[in-house]
Amino acid sequence: MSPLARTPRKTSVLDTVEHAATTPDQPQPYGELGLKDDEYRRIRQILGRRPTDTELAMYSVMWSEHCSYKSSKVHLRYFGETTSDEMRAAMLAGIGENAGVVDIGDGWAVTFKVESHNHPSYVEPYQGAATGVGGIVRDIMAMGARPVAVMDQLRFGAADAPDTRRVLDGVVRGIGGYGNSLGLPNIGGETVFDPCYAGNPLVNALCVGVLRQEDLHLAFASGAGNKIILFGARTGLDGIGGVSVLASDTFDAEGSRKKLPSVQVGDPFMEKVLIECCLELYAGGLVIGIQDLGGAGLSCATSELASAGDGGMTIQLDSVPLRAKEMTPAEVLCSESQERMCAVVSPKNVDAFLAVCRKWEVLATVIGEVTDGDRLQITWHGETVVDVPPRTVAHEGPVYQRPVARPDTQDALNADRSAKLSRPVTGDELRATLLALLGSPHLCSRAFITEQYDRYVRGNTVLAEHADGGMLRIDQSTGRGIAVSTDASGRYTLLDPYAGAQLALAEAYRNVAVTGATPVAVTNCLNFGSPEDPGVMWQFTQAVRGLADGCADLGIPVTGGNVSFYNQTGSAAILPTPVVGVLGVIDDVRRRIPTGLGAEPGETLMLLGDTRDEFDGSVWAQVTADHLGGLPPVVDLAREKLLAAVLSSASRDGLVSAAHDLSEGGLAQAIVESALAGETGCRIVLPEGADPFVLLFSESAGRVLVAVPRTEESRFRGMCEARGLPAVRIGVVDQGSDAVEVQGLFAVSLAELRATSEAVLPRYFG
């Protein structure tokens, strides 16, 4: 049962503001709604009386962890403190808006954001994941943009765990079912398996939108007399207390059973029509301000619009179109029914606004207006059930300085190095290691999942599966495009949260750079355990500082993000998992750099960057010994900037025909993936004196495998030398070969590599 459903459904007396003022001692179930004693006292102090049942519901959802960021807000300010004026120069909208917006030149702007829908996706995987996609798409719509692509970051329990099949199957079908129905290409992401995510899967959805700069819209209610119009789907009982309450608590031993009513139900076809309706409304200049209805529903939309504006607001709640009978005011206000938007419209444009909605068969209703006061007042059949200062609901909720303490176990964890593990030496052992990693759920092909998504709908996808970053064309006439990548490593972040966040940033940045695009902006989704655990808060604060400092070093701003706490069951938290998304810009997608080898005959393979003996937290340690300990790889952000600059120049000058970043599985995995993507073999010749195991499997950061046309090798090598970037020749592409050969050690046919990689997920989930 949803917590909000515990508020009285039918009473002999409607709990109006007048009634609340005359019944100060009436008991209220604030604790069941997630409010602490001190929070309830503060609400009474703000109002000068006890809240009505409807006000109590409104404050409870808006002051929840998910909506208020009450445990993280004090730390998230560090992003602003480390963002320079130069970094802000290209930002048209940033933290605090529905999504960040970046100027990418030629009058174009891009908006992108990643958000979590973790808890609902465990309770009801299909709808949880589907509505996660729908929610982030509406955030992008609310900025005035056309959504053009989605990505996803997924974390599940061990592949062989009994419940993983249920969760993965529903989540993947939900993402594909909703995104495919919207006609949005899914251009990339990650899927990770680890026992810590059993019972607490992570479903982080990213959406990218494109707009002309003059079409930017923001969430505010301004101008007394302007009308508030609710449009989209009808309001029902689904999702009441969904992300706002469900996502602000941990699961207990009962797991998901008691939480089913809190999951929203999505209709992608309604959302598809809503997208086109919104774009026509924007084009007609009919919208002053707009807000999507997601977590906390109308409670959020009305209070945030009023709080961000220059006046107050009145709402006639009984005007809201319903799809369930006998809903209470609290339920109407807090419903998280999907596919709804709330707009501020000039009275002179109301008829035109409603006409556009009728054209698209979108239900639209005037439910209120902006006032010249400073209160949000909501009535129910003529009686006032809410009378509050909107800022106290939307932006002035509680802010906690939670206790922060480095875990007592951290020193022992860092001292437990992987150097003690037995390493492969012979050619046969190295070959077996390669196949063991490739044949594990951690590094195997994700085609079983990605083939359920449409990657090329709309015809603007330039890079998707196999590529490190997804790429889209946004301007047909000039070829201007964007590249996006998302990355995270909970294992590295557990070992060192500061460095782990920077490694996620560095990999996402590098994944964009290897496409030939220039990284320009960052978004994030910070997934952690309970903020009431001082050890979790230490992980969180360190990760925030690492990410903020890293962005400052790279000179690219954080444009927005999301925090997801309480990802744990009982006292068992997930690995700290900061997901980082990086946006890049390329002036002409025709100069993109693909992943696959063999575009040019006789390409030279070169390794850029330094390889160190770094195996702590690696996939090799995980697969061969189930080991997690030590220190993560060194991160050098100055080197990452240098790599990006070299790759951009090489792309522009035609010096590189393929590129692939090195991360999990090291050089060996990158070679295999590039060879399979290009369906061509290669011969690897390790540099003299190199340790084969270290060179092939180390996960040192700041490295890229590139294929260079034979005629451009000396020119490319000269560019790297001039800029101080290590570049080592490690082999050649052999289009006449059907194998990956490491000279003097081993060879594996492409057929065996492909079969090993592609058999894994169907074996578990097919």
Swiss-Prot record:
GO molecular function, one term: ATP binding
Enzyme Commission code: 6.3.5.3
PANTHER family recorded: PHOSPHORIBOSYLFORMYLGLYCINAMIDINE SYNTHASE SUBUNIT PURL (PTHR43555:SF1)
InterPro entries listed in its UniProt record: PRibForGlyAmidine_synth_PurL, PurL_linker, PurM-like_C_dom, PurM-like_C_sf, PurM-like_N, PurM-like_N_sf
UniProtKB keywords: ATP-binding, Cytoplasm, Ligase, Magnesium, Metal-binding, Nucleotide-binding, Purine biosynthesis
Residues of the active site: 66, 117 (proton acceptor)
Subcellular location(s) per record: Cytoplasm
Stated role: Part of the phosphoribosylformylglycinamidine synthase complex involved in the purines biosynthetic pathway. Catalyzes the ATP-dependent conversion of formylglycinamide ribonucleotide (FGAR) and glutamine to yield formylglycinamidine ribonucleotide (FGAM) and glutamate. The FGAM synthase complex is composed of three subunits. PurQ produces an ammonia molecule by converting glutamine to glutamate. PurL transfers the ammonia molecule to FGAR to form FGAM in an ATP-dependent manner.
Binding site for Mg(2+) 2: 139, 292
Reactions it catalyzes: N(2)-formyl-N(1)-(5-phospho-beta-D-ribosyl)glycinamide + L-glutamine + ATP + H2O = 2-formamido-N(1)-(5-O-phospho-beta-D-ribosyl)acetamidine + L-glutamate + ADP + phosphate + H(+)
Residues binding ATP: 69, 113, 524, 561
Keyword Nucleotide-binding assigned: yes
Metabolic or biological pathway, per its Swiss-Prot or TrEMBL entry: Purine metabolism; IMP biosynthesis via de novo pathway; 5-amino-1-(5-phospho-D-ribosyl)imidazole from N(2)-formyl-N(1)-(5-phospho-D-ribosyl)glycinamide: step 1/2
Amino-acid positions noted as binding substrate in the UniProt annotation, renumbered to this chain: 116-119, 138, 264, 336-338, 564
Annotated residues for binding of Mg(2+) 1: 115, 562
Organism: Mycobacterium tuberculosis (strain CDC 1551 / Oshkosh)
Protein's name in the database: Phosphoribosylformylglycinamidine synthase subunit PurL
Highest taxon of source: Bacteria
Assembly description: Monomer. Part of the FGAM synthase complex composed of 1 PurL, 1 PurQ and 2 PurS subunits.
Pfam families reported in the protein's UniProt record: AIRS (PF00586), AIRS_C (PF02769), FGAR-AT_linker (PF18072)
Family, as annotated: Belongs to the FGAMS family.
